[in-house]
Each structure stands twice: as structure tokens, then as C-alpha cells.
Swiss-Prot record:
Family statement: Belongs to the peptidase M17 family.
Name of the protein described by the UniProt record: Probable cytosol aminopeptidase
SUPFAM superfamilies: Macro domain-like (SSF52949), Zn-dependent exopeptidases (SSF53187)
Matches recorded under PROSITE patterns: CYTOSOL_AP
Amino acid sequence: MEYRVKSTALLDIKSNIIIGLYENGELSPSAQKIDEISQGYLSKLIQSGEIKGKLGQVLVLRHVPNYSAERVFVVGAGKKGEINEKQFKQLIQDTINAVKATSAKEVISYLSDIKIKDRDLYWNIRFSVETLETSIYQFEQFKSKKSEQDVALTDVIFSAEGDVAQQAVNHAKAIALGVRAAKDVANCPPNVCNPVYLAEQANALATRSDLIKTTVLGEKDMADLGMNAYLAVSQGSVNEAQLSLIEYRNHPNPDAKPIVLVGKGLTFDAGGISLKPAEGMDEMKYDMGGAASVYGVMNAIAELKLPLNVIGVLAGCENLPDGNAYRPGDILTTMKGLTVEVLNTDAEGRLVLCDTLTYVERFEPELVIDVATLTGACVVALGAHNSGLISTDDKLAKDLELAAAQSTDKAWRLPLGEEYQEQLKSNFADLANIGGRWGGAITAGAFLSNFTDKYRWAHLDIAGTAWLQGANKGATGRPVPLLVQFLINQATGK
């Protein structure tokens, strides 16, 4: 799909146009002009009750009197001044469904007339593009017979003026690219997407951007570094663990401290010796959702060429049962030197992450954000709507909350205090790898915090938001929009 910004006179439109109508029958500015051109044609339709302006209602008009456009899509915009982001995205979804049902190849959208509550033109256009891209995404690489998509639409033009509108399109396209990249990797089956495959994707990204350099550490490299907790998780798998470092450097000051994003990359997690239930185990291919999202973010910022230094780290690994697998009761010495008693081999993500969080100290980062499908407890607490946010730095937490609100990629901050460290005490080691039944998402974050004292740190638990279940089963690409928005804000000083 191609997206463009162009100030277009209504009278000059020959193809297809999208305009808005409010629930009380009030016409948007563009609809009002067409009503005047057509000598009250739209007003007559409103009076007859053929269109009511109900949110998401779409009426397709052809042969509008005195008007040369092939089709006019009249879209119900609900109550004027009350439409929120979620409603606007649904409006766009309903509109694109109506357009796709026709043979329209090009549409010119005047929905920039529609005011989203507490938002401006930038967000109107950006949400439009992001929603359109979500609606057309399909993952069919492994189907012998592809879906028949008889969709003619190839061009969407936003009738607007100024740099803000073009910036919205540019940002949205880059974010959509990142989301798509994250989805493609996460949806890939685990017999294909193993740690080596993840590393190959990282290397391929470096070939597509001159701003990126990739380094991959294998198990021998990690053993030499003392990353024993990470390696213990991998012991049960024949597929070697891979730690992929994607270095993006484009800051005006080449020595500027980097922002580091760490993604948990368990390409399959059977739970190890503490085996998971069979039902739903196929979804554990999504346990690399953190690494997938970091990979997606790196794609997006390379497209945007943000003036930042950012390092994306994909901590690839598998957790499988085997005669060589690590066991409950094992005590592991981490790269940091702290010892950890393994009480549950299915609490493996924190073991992979703790060594990775220690490893990234060498970059002297400005800040570190780890992203992980870490705990079922986070899903119980927040459901599938909000990612869990934990941080030892209030400023960083607030910046992430702002980016979450701006992008509508929601996150909710969870508490973190010394009392949660009490739950991680072990009689035999410095730490236990689980903290008991209560507050599991928080104790997981508390565990990780023991390895982050050298920098500002935040943790995003995306166990509930990384993929969907049911009829729409598949990766969501979250929290790519949140993280890219955070980086845009960092680049612009907001």
C-alpha cells in the first residue's frame, strides 16, 4: 500500500473520496462542500434516514449530482468532539472494509476533518495508516494455498497540508514496518525460528542499513564470559543459544551513550524439566515476543534514521526437557557473580535476561529497557490490554508511560520495593529464581533489578500483549509502537 499527503481540491477529484458525517446529522467541512456542490444531496439522505452518522456506518455513493468523483464514501463519525482513539481506529477499520469491497484503486481521505478527542492532525493521519496496515497484514508463508485477496486498493492519499501530515505518514509507515517485522518473526514456527534463525534476521538487517552493525555471540563466547545462567537454560536443546547484538549508531555525537533494548528470545519454551501443560503449549513459540519486538524496533528506527545510538539485543535460546537439561535444585553462578537456586525451570526467562543485563554494562548505556513475555502472573493482573511496566527510575517510567499513552500501546506501572526481594531469598544461594505464588510479575521484575545497578532500567512484561488467542490468533507486534514512540521522543527531546 502506498500512502501520500496531497492538498487536493474537492472539485478536482475523479477517483474516490472519503468524507465524515456526525451522528446529529452535522456535516464535516469536506462533506458540507460536497453537499453544496450536489445541491443538498447529502442533506436529503440524512433527512430520509438513509445515513445517520452512527460511528462506523459507511454509505457508498455513486453518481453524486454535479460531482465527478467515482465514489463517495460517507463515514459515520459518531458524536462530534467525543470520538476517542479506539473509536477512530474502529472507524478507519470499518471504512477500509467498505473500500476493499469495491474495485477502488485509489482513495482520497478527508477524514482529517474528524477531530479525535485531545489529538491533532498528526495523530489522525498516523492512526489511519497504522490501522490500515494492521488490517491488511497476513502471515501465510507456510500455507500451500494462499488466501485469494481480490483487493484493488493500492493508493491512499490524505488531503492535508504541511510537514506535520507528511511526518505522520513517515512515522506510521516506519512503525508499521517494525510491527510487521516483529509479527513475521514471532509467527514463524519454532522448527524454523530457532536461536540461529533469530541471529540470521539480525544479520540480514545489517545488510539493509548502513547505520547498523550486527555481532552474534555463540555458546562458547558466552561460556568464556561466565554467562552460566543463560547457558543453563539452553542445555536441554540441540539448537545453540545465540546472543545477537544489533548496533544502530546515528547520533551527531558518535560517543553519545546508547539506549539499550534487551529482548527475551525463547524461540520455544516447553518449561524444561518443570514441563508446561500440553494444552496451549504451541503458543510458547511466542516466548520470543520480546526479541521479536526489539528486532521490529530496530527495523523501524533504521527506516526513520533517528539521531540516536541504540543497541538492540536478541537473547535467543530454547528451554526443553532432556537428559542434559538443567534441574530444579540446581545452583547457577551468574555473570554478575550472584548465585541463583533454580526452584522452577519454567522461570527461565529471568535467567537468560539476568546475564544479558549484566553483559550490556560494557556499553555504558544511557538506559536499558528489557522486553519479555516473562510471567503468566502479569496476564492475570493486567489481561491482554496493558503491558506490565516495572522500573527503578521514576523519570524513565514516566517517559515510557507517556509513549504508551501517545501510541495507544498501553502499559501499566507495577510497584517495586524491598519487600518483594524478601520473597526471593534462598537458604542455599543468593537468590531463588521464583518468589512464591503472590505478586509473580513483580517478583520477576525484582529478580531482574538485582542485575541493573549500573544504569537506569525499566522492564516491560508483555506476556499478555505479545499475541492474540482465538479466531485472531497471532502475534500483535506490541510493544513496537510504544518503544518507537519512546525513541522518537528521546530523539526530539520531548
